[in-house]
Regions:
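Glycoside hydrolase catalytic-domain context in secreted enzymes
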Residues: 1-254
């Protein structure tokens, strides 16, 4: 998998041990006598490979075209690079609402309009997933509308505003685009961590919208000092717990 938002975000270069008997997919990690190659460190007995990805326009710029057909073509271009670099899952697009112009990741998101956000995200999804083996992850589900204290902020929102503004774009993307996965957000929604919300993951996404793909947590969602512990994420309906607290699996998962 690879992150977004403006195309595929990969390490500029990686190395493969010249004498490795076997390597991981794409040779990102090659085996050495003392373990795997350290990324970002040059080694004498290794070949260096460079990865040049296209820097596509960011989400806000794309949305200003109001052109769903163009967004589908953009998605197809992303999928071509995914195939080239053996990436199966793109951790994008981000499609949170522009609630405040000071949000640190507004550039990544499409718009303050949930309809526009949803329709354009759906077009991108269709483009990417038109190629077999290429999938999309829409994020951050939901109400991730600021970067400052994003792991602890509580988004207090009425049911009507939640449905009509902050979830509407995701609903359209799910129903019109059928993404492979959804990534939950760090923040709380009305006092409950989004990744711990069964109402959000199971009732809304799966039962109401009919989503049948994978739901995953964001990286470091389950850090030790946070209230969003792994068993709560699993119980809420997250299928995949992304890396965070090293003791997650041993200490908590069985409690789900």
């Amino acid at each position: 998998m690879a992150d977004g938002p403006a195309g595929i975000r990969l390490r500029q270069w990686y190395e493969v041990d010249k004498e490795a008997d076997s390597i991981y997919e794409m040779g990102v990690l090659g085996s050495l006598e003392n373990g795997i190659l350290e990324p970002g460190v040059h080694h004498e007995n290794a070949d260096t490979y460079y990865q040049y990805c296209t820097a596509f326009p960011v989400g806000t710029a794309l949305a200003q075209t109001w052109n769903a057909d163009l967004m589908t073509e953009f998605g197809k271009a992303i999928a071509e690079e995914m195939e080239e670099f053996h990436v199966n899952l793109w951790l994008a697009p981000g499609m949170n609402i522009h609630r405040n112009p000071l949000c640190g990741r507004n550039y990544e998101y499409y718009s303050e309009d949930p309809y526009l956000s949803g329709m354009l995200a759906a077009a991108v999804i269709r483009g990417v997933q038109s190629k077999s083996g290429c999938g999309v992850t829409i994020k951050h589900f939901a109400c991730n509308n600021q970067e400052d204290n994003r792991m602890g902020v509580d988004s207090c929102v009425s049911e009507r505003a939640l449905r009509e503004i902050y979830l509407r774009g995701f609903e359209i993307a799910v129903k019109e685009g059928n993404p492979v996965s959804i990534m939950t957000s760090y923040n709380l929604i009305n006092g409950i961590h989004a990744a711990n919300s069964k109402d959000l993951c199971m009732t809304v996404a799966r039962k109401e919208w009919g989503f049948d793909g994978a739901i995953m947590s964001d990286w470091n969602t389950t850090v030790p000092e946070d209230g969003s512990v792994p068993w709560k994420c699993v119980a809420a309906g997250n299928d995949i717990i992304m890396p965070g607290n090293p003791d997650d699996c041993l200490l908590y998962t069985s409690d789900a």
